[in-house]
Amino acid sequence: MARFLLGAAAIALLAGVSSLLLMVPFAEAYDPLDPNGNITIKWDITQWTPDGYVAVVTIYNFQKYRHIQAPGWSLGWAWAKKEIIWSMAGGQATEQGDCSAFKANIPHCCKRDPRVVDLVPGAPYNMQFGNCCKGGVLTSWVQDPLNAVASFQITVGHSGTSNKTVKAPKNFTLKAPGPGYSCGLAQEVKPPTRFISLDGRRTTQAHVTWNVTCTYSQFVAQRAPTCCVSLSSFYNETIVNCPKCACGCQNKKPGSCVEGNSPYLASVVNGPGKGSLTPLVQCTPHMCPIRVHWHVKLNYRDYWRVKVTITNWNYRMNYSQWNLVVQHPNFENVSTVFSFNYKSLNPYGVINDTAMMWGVKYYNDLLMVAGPDGNVQSELLFRKDRSTFTFDKGWAFPRRIYFNGESCVMPSPDLYPWLPPSSTPRFRTVFLLMSFLVCGTLAFLHNHLVLDKNCGKC
């Protein structure tokens, strides 16, 4: 009996450990700033064909602040049967695969595990489809919901031809453009999607709808940091630079970084690596492609002012549709944000300590490559809340900053520019007490000398 109980306990323990291990990816994927953020893939079968179906596949970026930048998304899956792709509109498979079994009417793709990408802007009209042809770039949901959606049409053959015989694809993978996303199983949605005509007078319905949800995890992405933060203030001469080696360390390997004043700069930038996704950064102690500088600029009676500067140190990438997320307790009292768009994310309900900022369209929504034009800046005006406001102990600096969804490396809090000792309340109190003591002593000595002088005359 004891052996049986011991064995049962061991099995229960193993089951518990297995459950925890299964939960790890999901726990890592949880984003406290955007707990419901995800990318949803909707697969709508709209028409049956003699050997398969026609489907509309739509990708929704429901993430508040994380977008998909160039070279864009790529979506992969594995067929449940021996399906093929006869044709596509609004997207294309990256590889055709082995279609040698077909003598005529060659399919678009015969691979068991196709991977599809978006078409680039300017694609031929007969290849386009609604919400296509953005080069795979999707904005975040907060910035521009209309451009946070992509669609393509796919004609599938050698599959089922009814609701009972058709099977959903499996093993979905999403790259945007690199790793980081984990996708779940395709789930059938009931009732299926309904489509409204352009004139709004007719509604049609998909035969079958499947949904796939993909979530982002920095643990899965395993990316090195891509940005860092530096700090300064009007009340302290100290400039706190980005931490050394925040995104990597300089090495002696040629081409690992470029000096900004190098006479060979143009030849290196336009060299063999041009067009590569690997950053070519200016040689700095931090080696980050992006630096965010927070400067406490001015202090008024009822307000205080901050200047934020984003600098691109990467010679190989323009950052289009960039965004910045900042956590600071005084965003509850933000008054004006100049030259940036602004929206509170409110991840904790009523507490407003997280703000998202991005560029104004056609003005500063494009962060140019490293160089004279490789920066954007704004100023923020905060109203003072007398119950919480202070410049003491680094309170005026942000708790956390994210650029394009990636957490930036912050300086150590003990390095933050603090108020000089003469500005602290404790020092002012001691100074006042000492002043009263000195004045009292002088008054006492004065009176004592006057009395001694008068008594001497008596």
Swiss-Prot record:
Subcellular location: Membrane
Membrane topology reported for the UniProt record: Single-pass membrane protein
Keywords (A to Z) from UniProt: Glycoprotein, Membrane, Signal, Transmembrane, Transmembrane helix
GO cellular component terms, A-Z: plasma membrane
Alphabetical GO biological process terms: cellulose microfibril organization; plant-type cell wall cellulose biosynthetic process
InterPro entries: COB_C, COBRA_pln
One Pfam family of this chain: COB_C
Signal peptide range in chain numbering: 1-29
Chain ranges passing through the membrane: 430-450
Glycan-linked positions: N38, N163, N171, N211, N236, N318, N333, N352
Main localisation: membrane
Family recorded in the similarity comment: Belongs to the COBRA family.
Name the record gives this protein: COBRA-like protein 2
